[in-house]
Amino acid sequence: MTDRPVLHLSLPVDDLHAARDFYERTLGCRIGREREDWFDAWFFGLQLTLQLRPQEVKDVSQQGVRHFGVVLPSLTEFDELVHRVAASGHAWISKPEIHSDAELNGKLGGKLADPSGNIIEIKFYADSADYLS
């Protein structure tokens, strides 16, 4: 058990096997507890529960602004994840790019969706102080 709070998020999926493959192989998440209709994935410090709820799954086009994500601590980790996504053949919704406008200066980020349409943003900031400012 950890002495620090752990954030938990639960999302619907329509195919547990495809979800597990995506989170484990493509994103590199460690898989935790598993049951017939759900499993936990350790998503960069977040306990992510993927539940078989096909009736609750929405297409990416219906997600609007809804997404979750991670700010990776190093450019190396960001690049490794980008390469794993490329090797998996999984497409990006918005390919990783450097944002250079004043508000997002130095942010490197992209978005992709899991096989059930849950949108995930992957980010890296050149200056770690920027992501909470």
Predicted features and spans:
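Short glycine-enriched loop/turn motifs at secondary-structure junctions
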Residues: 2-5, 61-65, 104
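Conserved catalytic-core motifs of GNAT/GCN5-like acyltransferases
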Residues: 30-36, 97-99, 124-129
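Vicinal oxygen chelate
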Residues: 16-17, 69-116
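Core segments of cupin and vicinal oxygen chelate
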Residues: 10-49, 53
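N-terminal beta-strand motif that seeds the catalytic metal site of vicinal oxygen chelate
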Residues: 1-17, 47, 68-70, 124-133
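Short, flexible, solvent-exposed loop/turn segments with mixed acidic/basic and small polar residues
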Residues: 56-60
